[in-house]
From Swiss-Prot:
TM stretches of this protein: 32-54, 65-86, 107-128, 149-169, 195-219, 249-270, 284-308
Sites of S-palmitoyl cysteine lipidation: 322
UniProt-recorded name of the protein: Substance-P receptor
Record organism: Meriones unguiculatus (Mongolian jird)
S-S bridge residues: 105-180
Localisation: Cell membrane
Record field: compositional bias (Polar residues): 376-407
Glycosylation positions in this chain: 14, 18, 89, 189
GO biological process: positive regulation of flagellated sperm motility; regulation of uterine smooth muscle contraction
Molecular function in Gene Ontology: substance P receptor activity
Sorted UniProt keywords: Cell membrane, Disulfide bond, G-protein coupled receptor, Glycoprotein, Lipoprotein, Membrane, Palmitate, Receptor, Transducer, Transmembrane, Transmembrane helix
Function: This is a receptor for the tachykinin neuropeptide substance P. It is probably associated with G proteins that activate a phosphatidylinositol-calcium second messenger system.
Topological region Cytoplasmic: 55-64, 129-148, 220-248, 309-407
Extracellular-facing ranges: 1-31, 87-106, 170-194, 271-283
Amino acid sequence: MDNVLPGDSDLFPNISTNSSESNQFVQPAWQIVLWAAAYTVIVVTSVVGNVVVMWIILAHKRMRTVTNYFLVNLAFAEASMAAFNTVVNFTYAVHNEWYYGLFYCKFHNFFPIAAVFASIYSMTAVAFDRYMAIIHPLQPRLSATATKVVIFVIWVLALLLAFPQGYYSTTETMPGRVVCMIEWPEHPNRTYEKAYHICVTVLIYFLPLLVIGYAYTVVGITLWASEIPGDSSDRYHEQVSAKRKVVKMMIVVVCTFAICWLPFHVFFLLPYINPDLYVKKFIQQVYLAIMWLAMSSTMYNPIIYCCLNDRFRLGFKHAFRCCPFISAGDYEGLEMKSTRYLQTQGSVYKVSRLETTISTVVGAHEDEAEEGPKATPSSLDLTSNGSSRSNSKTMTESSSFYSNMLA
């Protein structure tokens, strides 16, 4: 994401308002090379990683779940932002000259807001889906059609939020160069501009992060506190360990997003408090570093999936099997694990009325098996119904599939 808040002309006032001065932000060649290498890492890692994530989900039928469709949307938004905006924003920040014309100036300021909105609200949808599956397992789940409708609505809202910044973007010719800037309607104290920037910051950072944090906190506490009375088997402890891994993964995802984007939003809100800070020469290096950190958020999710989820790890190994230092692994596991689980589920379904209810809950969440937390409703329901040790053991056998996948 680039000019989500003030445009570069607002960030570096002298490049658009003082045409008689030379460009004080010109960098030595060695600095440009280092920054170019750093931004290249983001583009390559993000585009390749997120494309592989989309392939893993869309090319394997058992991976096409409600949650994973949101992950596809998240991966698409992040890969698109890395591909279409990172390099352009880097060259503009380094040279302070716009080479790409009026249309791309508007797109350059418009698309990042839409992409970040789609990304964070895809994460929010995943958090809500997790919350409902674990805290309210008997409530109806989203269908595939409803999931696609939600994704469509997310993008419509994203485009509407981004429209003003794209609409008011324009290019202006200065002596010796062209700049891309945002010309907001004139109003005392820049009221429209401030209101829009604050609104964007709240909607694409603070509000969704608050919702995600609450949902995952409740889910994490519920998972951590869940116990099965009378069952102290090794398999039970494996399940507890798997649940803790899921909680750690949630914390990693949320904290990664928060850490990457917080400096960016603070940086672009500071002009309203101390505008003189942004005419200092060192501010360009600060801006490049903060923008790199924010843009790097697009490349971390594939790494997190690969490290913390067995199915994604298998998919990545297969995608990069041509590399001499990567073993292909059990690629058939992407499909076969679900088949084996269906057989286990069938045996559980026939045991008793109580276990019929339990297996129905598990069956409703079978499509989420690859992500782990969906195993929780079965164990939680088992605790609340006070089932016997034999019932608990039977349930442990079926839900151990989830534990094995997250081990």
